[in-house]
């Protein structure tokens, strides 16, 4: 004689989240308030004999199982359990209000693009280095040509060079018998243009100006006039 197995799809309940000290009797005691119980079993560990944290309860009818599953706060042996029909599995845990979980924000530049297109990485402002600005140092008049490879073509520098050139020209033309044109000594270059150039060579020795002046002194005016008259 073959016995037909009873359909327990809507009467067998899965109970999860049980403490280690929960037994079959304590599990049955909790579900008795919902109706008649056919079976209550706690799954235990074979070596230790303690509860593995879940069990199964089979109610006599479907209405009793529905009442047990609708309990909003099932507390078994001091711990809230997860009660649901066995064929549905454990209920998904509901987030309790008042708790927020922060998700780290991902910068849009670090999201990988499809089809193998390379991603342009954008670095935060904190990692960007500022542009290097070289401060301009105004050279002094005495050390402009000796310490800096760039000649300062400002008005002050031209005034210095113009005065020195005027003095040297006056010393040279004093020994020449013919008067020089005023335009030659009164010319001063316009200032305002500046550009970088190589380090200028050392100025001519003072002896060269003296040698040129001596050569003009030895050439007599009479000889010049005689040559012009020929």
From Swiss-Prot:
Domain RRM, chain residue ranges per copy: 11-88
Its job: Multifunctional RNA-binding protein involved in the regulation of pre-mRNA splicing, mRNA stability and mRNA translation important for cell fate decision and differentiation. Plays a major role in pre-mRNA alternative splicing regulation. Mediates preferentially muscle-specific exon inclusion in numerous mRNAs important for striated cardiac and skeletal muscle cell differentiation. Binds to intronic splicing enhancer (ISE) composed of stretches of GU-rich motifs localized in flanking intron of exon that will be included by alternative splicing.
Compartment list: Nucleus; Cytoplasm
Annotated GO CC locations: cytoplasm; cytosol; nucleus
GO molecular function: mRNA 3'-UTR AU-rich region binding; mRNA 3'-UTR binding; mRNA CDS binding; pre-mRNA intronic binding; RNA binding; sequence-specific mRNA binding
Alphabetical keyword list: Cytoplasm, Differentiation, mRNA processing, mRNA splicing, Nucleus, RNA-binding, Translation regulation
Gene of this entry: rbm24
GO BP terms, alphabetized: 3'-UTR-mediated mRNA destabilization; atrial cardiac muscle tissue development; circulatory system development; DNA damage response; embryonic neurocranium morphogenesis; eye development; hair cell differentiation; heart looping
A Pfam cross-reference name: RRM_1
Annotated TM spans: none
Gene3D superfamilies registered for this protein in UniProt: 3.30.70.330
Entries under InterPro entries matching the protein: Nucleotide-bd_a/b_plait_sf, RBD_domain_sf, RNA-binding_reg, RRM_dom
Protein name: RNA-binding protein 24
């Amino acid at each position: 004689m073959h016995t037909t197995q009873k359909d327990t799809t809507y009467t067998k309940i899965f109970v999860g989240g049980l403490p280690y000290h929960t037994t079959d009797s304590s599990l049955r005691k909790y579900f008795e308030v919902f109706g008649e119980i056919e079976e209550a079993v706690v799954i235990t560990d074979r070596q230790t004999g303690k509860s593995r944290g879940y069990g199964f309860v089979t109610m006599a009818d479907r209405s009793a199982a529905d009442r047990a599953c609708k309990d909003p706060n099932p507390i078994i042996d001091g711990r809230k359990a997860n009660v649901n029909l066995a064929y549905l599995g454990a209920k998904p845990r509901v987030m309790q209000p008042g708790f927020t979980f922060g998700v780290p924000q991902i910068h849009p530049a670090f999201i990988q693009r499809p089809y193998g297109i390379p991603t342009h990485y954008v670095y935060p402002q904190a990692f960007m280095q500022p542009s290097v600005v070289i401060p301009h140092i105004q050279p002094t008049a005495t050390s402009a040509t000796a310490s800096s490879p760039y000649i300062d073509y400002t008005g002050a520098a031209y005034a210095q060079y113009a005065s020195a050139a005027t003095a040297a020209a006056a010393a040279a033309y004093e020994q020449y018998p013919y008067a020089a044109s005023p335009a030659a000594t009164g010319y001063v270059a316009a200032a305002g243009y500046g550009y970088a150039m190589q380090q200028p060579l050392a100025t001519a020795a003072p002896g060269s100006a003296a040698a040129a002046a001596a050569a003009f002194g030895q050439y007599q005016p009479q000889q010049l006039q005689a040559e012009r008259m020929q």
